[in-house]
């Protein structure tokens, strides 16, 4: 074992980790950025929380890194309590050691299956964070029911992004009841949110995303729970299907029904709230969290202001129109000079969000080449 630091927290973790289910206790150092962002986003949610008690649950605790960082780093004037669970007795032992290391008394540890822990606490938690190895689907129903408190927050991660991005079409249909679209990584998180919205609606619960990102091998989202059939109906209205023709997307509402050639359903509404993003960015900066977490939050703070589902991949677009790829910064400059909004995206170095149409981009790239060459 070794002791490391993440954020403002000390953690005892395995000396070596294979990052697989074979590990005695699971700890992924590559997810420090994920945890930095998670603490920042939940802090932004907590800043607007107006009750005296704040109850959180991390039912898939592993080494306890996520839940312990919540317990140690979240600032709240009331009573903040965190429940951490894991089915693995070795993990439970390590979680307890990490609690002692940080001298925390606001955490309760459970040696229990995640679904059992969540099902025992129906309508109890203000925040449930599902961070599994693989897909969150096996835990989603229990997570929704456990976070049914008015204005609760459901956080979830999917590390099966190859499935969500279309590499395993049949698996996606089977697990998420949706047809994936290859290419744009943002659609992975939109597909995951769409599935969660459908699952929650059967309990007359609407889910409203307040922050989402796709980083490395995972998709991550934070969704506020809104009670009532009307809220569920409103959430469903944000679902729809996408058809990709060359570089152009066509859309159909969920209510219109599936049509051959389309993919989805995806969540087509806003997936990150500008105020939450900005507050999360300030939190990450003020606490000296990892530079990478700050960089991701800064990009999302810009891209979330542009209403576009997915992005334009300049590399793919130039390949399609048989042009050399200009510097992305030059394209951005030309778009701005022509009155368009534009931003890089956090998940693709060649990706741009813009209110320009595909035809506008083609013209600007062609004009760039005619002037340059």
Swiss-Prot record:
Protein name listed in UniProt: tRNA (guanine(26)-N(2))-dimethyltransferase
Pfam families linked to this entry: TRM
Keywords: Methyltransferase, RNA-binding, S-adenosyl-L-methionine, Transferase, tRNA processing, tRNA-binding
Species this chain originates from: Methanococcus maripaludis (strain C6 / ATCC BAA-1332)
Family indicated by similarity: Belongs to the class I-like SAM-binding methyltransferase superfamily. Trm1 family.
Any single biological process term in GO: tRNA N2-guanine methylation
Enzyme class per UniProt: transferase
Origin superkingdom: Archaea
A GO term, aspect molecular function: tRNA (guanine(26)-N2)-dimethyltransferase activity
EC number: 2.1.1.216
Residues binding S-adenosyl-L-methionine: 35, 66, 86, 113-114
Function, as annotated: Dimethylates a single guanine residue at position 26 of a number of tRNAs using S-adenosyl-L-methionine as donor of the methyl groups.
Catalytic activity: guanosine(26) in tRNA + 2 S-adenosyl-L-methionine = N(2)-dimethylguanosine(26) in tRNA + 2 S-adenosyl-L-homocysteine + 2 H(+)
Residue ranges constituting the Trm1 methyltransferase domain according to the UniProt record: 2-365
């Amino acid at each position: 074992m070794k002791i490391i630091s993440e954020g403002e927290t000390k953690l005892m973790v395995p000396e070596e980790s294979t990052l697989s289910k074979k590990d005695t206790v699971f700890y992924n150092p590559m997810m420090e950025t994920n945890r930095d962002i998670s603490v920042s986003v939940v802090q932004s949610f907590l800043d607007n929380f107006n009750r005296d008690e704040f109850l959180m649950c991390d039912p898939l605790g592993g080494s306890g890194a996520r839940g312990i960082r919540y317990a140690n780093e979240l600032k709240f004037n009331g009573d903040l309590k965190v429940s951490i669970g894991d089915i693995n007795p070795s993990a439970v032992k390590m979680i307890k050691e990490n609690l002692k290391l940080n001298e925390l008394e606001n955490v309760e540890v459970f040696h229990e299956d995640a679904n059992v822990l969540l099902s025992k606490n129906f309508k109890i938690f203000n925040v449930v964070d599902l961070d599994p190895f693989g897909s969150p689907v096996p835990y989603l129903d229990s997570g929704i029911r456990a976070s049914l408190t008015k204005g609760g927050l459901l956080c979830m991660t999917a590390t099966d992004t190859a499935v969500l991005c279309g590499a395993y079409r049949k698996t996606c249909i089977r697990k998420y009841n949706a047809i994936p679209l290859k290419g744009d990584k943002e659609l992975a998180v939109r597909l995951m949110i769409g599935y969660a919205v459908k699952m929650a609606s059967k309990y007359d619960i609407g889910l409203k995303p307040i922050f989402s990102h796709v980083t490395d091998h995972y998709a991550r989202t934070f969704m506020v729970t809104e009670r009532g059939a009307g809220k569920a109906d409103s959430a469903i209205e944000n679902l729809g299907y996408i058809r990709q023709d060359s570089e152009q997307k066509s859309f159909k509402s969920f209510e219109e029904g599936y049509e051959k050639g389309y993919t989805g359903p995806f969540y087509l509404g806003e997936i990150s709230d500008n105020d939450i993003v900005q507050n999360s960015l300030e939190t990450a900066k003020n606490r000296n969290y990892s530079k990478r977490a700050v960089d991701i939050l800064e990009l999302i703070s810009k891209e979330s202001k542009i209403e576009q589902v997915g992005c334009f991949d300049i590399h793919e677009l130039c390949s399609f129109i048989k042009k050399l790829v200009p510097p992305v910064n030059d394209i951005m400059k030309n778009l701005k000079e022509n009155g368009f909004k534009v931003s890089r995206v956090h998940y693709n170095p060649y990706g741009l969000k813009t209110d320009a149409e595909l035809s506008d981009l083609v013209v600007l790239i062609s004009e760039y080449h005619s002037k340059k060459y």
